[in-house]
Amino acid sequence: GILPWNFPFFLVARKAAPALITGNTIVVKPSQLTPENAYVFAQIVEEVGLPAGVFNLVNGRGSVIGHELAANPKVGMVSLTGSVSAGQQTMAAAAPNITKVSLELGGKAPAIVMEDADIDLAVKSIIASRVINTGQVCNCAERVYVDKAIKETFMEKLVAGMKQVKVGNPNEIADLDMGPLIEASALKSMEKKVERAIQQGARLLCGGHRIGTKGYFFEPTVLDCVTQKMDIIQEETFGPVLPVVEYSDINDAIAWANDCEYGLTSSVYTQNLDNAFKVMRSLKFGE
């Protein structure tokens, strides 16, 4: 099991449990950015009496250790959660042995807000989805398509809600909504993505900047006047940035939602079940 850094303890359990339940051993390689969680997990399974060699832990860079695991002919299956490039490299390494590969990769999840949606519920859900783990989640809402008829009200509530998100160090302050980004390069990436969106014509409604000078904290951000071909719509954004696209025809919203190289998750907000199923059947996403 090759792990990312964004859910470093949960994903150990998610990969280990199916393997162990079905009578297999497992080798876990955590991200080099968050190695201690898997180490603690290994200590726990040792303390509860799991036989030596059933749960195994190795650390190192994915390009080195991950490659060796995927290429090893003794490995029966490789499960990776990570970037698209990491998935491609894993498949290539596993190919000579025709080793089974299971991948969960990047996402650019669209949220479609229809004219009859419960606006308050949609806003609350989308904000929660975008700021959880500071937006560093492959299946959280990354782009919003909202019906023109309700856009003004939706945007007012969305911006107000994003401005109310509590950001800080969870080791120092309780009752927070959002912590820091994973590292300095992630912070720089957010700054560049927002800057690029503005250069391409987007309008910054809130956020868009680093918070303070200590830590990798970034303001919850909303971008308006966004169009389909902008980088902020097409590229995965691992941070608390929400670009919003207006639509007048639901068929356009569906087409734009599908106009993306990712296909992990999506969401639809409507109070009409027929509308929900119609849109769901047309979206080319796994969830």
Where are the regions a protein language model picked out?
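Rossmann-like NAD(P) dinucleotide-binding subdomain of oxidoreductase/dehydrogenase enzymes
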Residues: 1-121, 175, 247, 275
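Residues in well-ordered alpha-helical elements
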Residues: 10, 120, 148, 152, ...
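Well-formed, non-transmembrane alpha-helical positions, independent of function
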Residues: 18, 68-69, 125, 196, ...
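Structural detector of well-ordered beta-strand residues that form the stable sheet scaffold
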Residues: 20, 27, 56, 102, ...
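Conserved C-terminal structural/oligomerization subdomain of aldehyde/semialdehyde dehydrogenase
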Residues: 75, 112, 199-200, 210, ...
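ALDH superfamily catalytic-core signature
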Residues: 77, 85-227, 256
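Residues that line or immediately flank small-molecule/substrate-binding pockets and catalytic motifs
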Residues: 82, 148, 271
